[in-house]
Amino acid sequence: MKKMTAVVALMAVFSVAICFIILGSISVELMAALQINEGQFGSLVMSLFLTCCVVQLIIGPLTDKLGYKPIAVLGFLVTSGSLFLLAFAPGYSLVRLACILLGLGAMCLNTVGNTLIPIVLFEGKDPARASNLGNAFFGLGYVVTPLLATLFLKTLHLSYGTSVAIIGGLVLVFLVFALATKFPPAATGYKFSMAVKLLAKPAVLLAGLALICYMSLEVSMATWIKKLMTELLGGYTVAGAAAKAGLALMLFGLAMMVGRFLASTMKNLTAMGAKVITAASLLSVVAIVVMIVTKSPAVAVAAILVTGLAFAPIFPTIVGVTFAKFEPALYGSIFGIIFAVGLLGGTFVPNLIGKMSVGRSVQGSLPIAAVAAGILFVISLFIGRVGEPKRTG
């Protein structure tokens, strides 16, 4: 039964990836169908992630009160329903509503997946390693979603609506598994008074600041890589440009998945996690700068691959290193705080890139991402110096 619980937790983080990358996967097609510009598309992304910010803070205490299963079932159900709404919404307003509902479903699954994974994998002894392995399946979602979108849109010549509906059907299958699985009772005692106290902990504050930078980077890449590559390939009207751009987005997800699987093979990753975050942040700065200056699609793809590999260990290692400084009973509280704070970056930075790209190019707006990566590098220098691990693997 514990294995099935782990499987559903992995399905949950896989589905969160679908929620985060689906708009980027159909960006060119959706913008053409709705006749909207980059700024309006960026507002859709902001609607999704602003909802995530609010819901992430609320869903923690609900999980403690109701248990994992109701939240998992709700998450899969709402995520599937919002994907169907996104698929068949006839106008911009309903697409925005779909994005809002997508945020609700995503954060239900995010809480279930990311709080269960460090407990059920590696017997709970190495949170950073477990988080990397679990979030490799998030990376898998980043691969499969744009790959399926490209297959459906460009090979099978399906509409973006039909393509998204098929992906929504996949999430419905995951719902069946959640309904059939027994979950452990929630072990985390999320109380508002406890959360307030945690906000004063330097380790929690640093993790939140680091995730603001990281989420701004990951969501920006997931949202704008396809549009960036379409620009470098000559525009949407050039034959095959959108399909090749979609494959570039898939390669970004593939690099993240591979990087997280590799990171999960590092024993006692929690102990060396701060150094890993620092090195990955520095590599991210270099790769993003290359994306900004290059005019070559091939060089851009190489930079995208390096960016995916660099991003791979950052989020799960930040989470794991921070968890290791506290008792497991506080994991839900800590995750709710740092992820909700981090989502502020994912909410506003991609939207800002979109607004700055109107009448210009996505490539010309990417320096914002380079600055975020640089700030993350500076913050990472302090993560290992604040707080002492409560337990070792």
Task: Mark where each language-model region is.
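Conserved MFS/SLC helix-loop-helix module at the cytosolic interface between two early adjacent transmembrane helices
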Residues: 54-90
